[in-house]
Design a protein with these regions (language model features):
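Conserved nucleotide-binding/hydrolysis micro-motifs of P-loop NTPases
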Residues: 58-60, 82-83, 107-110, 125-129, ...
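Basic Arg/Gly/Lys-rich low-complexity intrinsically disordered segments
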Residues: 1-8, 68, 96, 163-164, ...
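A short beta-strand element within the Helicase C-terminal
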Residues: 112-124, 143-147
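Conserved helicase ATPase core of P-loop NTP-dependent helicases/translocases
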Residues: 62-67, 73-110, 133
Length: 209
């Protein structure tokens, strides 16, 4: 009897659409060279939360870890250059609340068995829309997802939104100006000419920040 009820719940709970709808999502358009500064500003509002930051490379994970530690964030990076015992130790500290921020890659995130994640911050978008949903699914509960999107990543964002059948809310931080919408080459799913996602001059402070 329990098998009959558990299986459908598991399937529905991890369905891409369900994951997207249960997660509060927002996107910040930003030039690549401004991402580090924006990350620090955003994390100031999440110092007490359990945060996972996902990047594309081990080198970037190391650099962000060093930066955040220099700003007195309780952060640590975990990637393929670390031994399995080191990865497990970091995950245990995170799950116990002794570590607030883990910076990692998609590949390692799948092995860490992290709990109580409140925010998934995509410093880099993944290489596919499917991996974006996988990132969100690791929260397992209601949570928040923030994506920092550089101009070259906007076509992938369009793919993600197309699969989700919903445009992710755009937010802007005071002091950060998004670039003009890049010239796409057929990858973008929707016409953004009437409402460009990267705006040159309009800067507003995020409400509640």
């Amino acid at each position: 009897m329990s098998e009959q009820t558990d299986t459908p719940e598991e399937s529905i709970y991890h369905d891409q659409r369900s994951v997207a709808l249960r997660t509060t999502q927002s996107v910040y358009f930003v030039q690549e060279h401004d991402k580090v500064s924006m990350l620090g500003s955003l994390l100031n509002d999440h110092k007490e939360n359990q945060v996972v930051i996902v990047v594309k490379s081990k080198k970037k994970a190391d650099a962000l870890s060093e930066f955040l530690i220099s700003k007195e964030f309780n952060a640590h990076c975990v990637h393929g250059n670390h031994r399995q015992a080191q990865q497990k130790e970091a995950a245990t500290k995170f799950n116990l609340g002794a570590l607030n921020i883990i910076i990692t890659t998609d590949m390692i995130l799948k092995t860490l068995e992290l709990e109580n994640i409140k925010l998934v911050l995509s410093y880099d978008l993944p290489d596919s829309a499917q991996n974006y949903y996988i990132r969100l699914a690791f929260m397992k509960e209601l949570g928040e997802a923030i994506a920092l999107v550089s101009p070259e990543d906007e076509p992938l964002l369009s793919d993600i939104e197309s699969n989700m059948k919903k445009e992710i809310e755009e937010k802007v931080l005071e002091g950060f100006v998004a670039s003009a919408t890049p010239n796409h080459t057929g990858k973008t799913k929707k016409d953004r000419t009437k409402k460009p996602r990267h705006r040159k001059n309009k800067v507003k402070k995020e409400q509640g920040a």
